[in-house]
């Protein structure tokens, strides 16, 4: 029930802020071991409960696959598509990709983007080391070509810089004090590098 209540608040907040999509991670971030074999089913049932609220508020639910070191299920674009099928409601039908997570879950990031196709509504960008683009080894040209192939340059589709910095703990804001100047520099650098 807590997850459903949280989603209801976030749907309303997203609409009030003028947002068009809400990122949804199906599993508990930071818990890579499953509780039991029914996690996906429970998660899909919870999202199905609020599906019509997404539709009523005009907000797209964007499912984000996360690497297996951080969540217990939904690690790839294929997993996200299967999760959307498990939810089984046309109001829940989008994907939020993240190239950092795709590096460990997908065999080829470009092919995964093409597989997501018109379901992809946002793509998080960070380099292979989770720093700004250009500071690691990500193949940005392949990513841009794949986005071009799926016609991503259209209304309702976004590419969002999300460099969080290197390290084993990807969520420093949860456990310590983030460095706003460093995060701002990495986001600015990522946006500039992408535009080049």
Label the model's feature ranges.
Residues 1-94, 104-106, 181-185:
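Active-site acidic/histidine proton-transfer and metal-coordination neighborhood
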């Amino acid at each position: 029930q807590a997850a459903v209540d949280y989603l209801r608040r976030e749907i309303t907040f997203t609409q009030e802020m003028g947002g068009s999509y809400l990122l949804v991670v199906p599993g508990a971030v930071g818990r890579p071991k499953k509780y039991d074999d029914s996690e996906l089913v429970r998660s899909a049932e919870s999202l199905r409960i609020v599906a019509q609220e997404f539709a009523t508020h005009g907000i797209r639910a964007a499912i984000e696959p996360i690497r297996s070191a951080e969540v217990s299920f939904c690690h790839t674009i294929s997993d996200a598509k299967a999760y959307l099928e498990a939810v089984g409601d046309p109001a829940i039908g989008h994907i939020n990709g993240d190239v950092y997570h795709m590096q460990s879950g997908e065999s080829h990031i470009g092919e995964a983007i093409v597989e997501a196709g018109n379901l992809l509504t946002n793509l998080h960008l960070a380099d292979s080391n989770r720093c700004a683009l250009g500071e690691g080894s990500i193949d940005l040209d392949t990513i841009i070509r794949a986005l071009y192939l799926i016609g991503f340059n259209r209304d309702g589709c976004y590419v969002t810089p999300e460099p969080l910095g290197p390290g084993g703990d990807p969520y420093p804001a949860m456990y310590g004090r983030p460095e706003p100047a460093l995060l701002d520099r990495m986001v600015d650098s990522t946006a500039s590098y992408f535009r080049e």
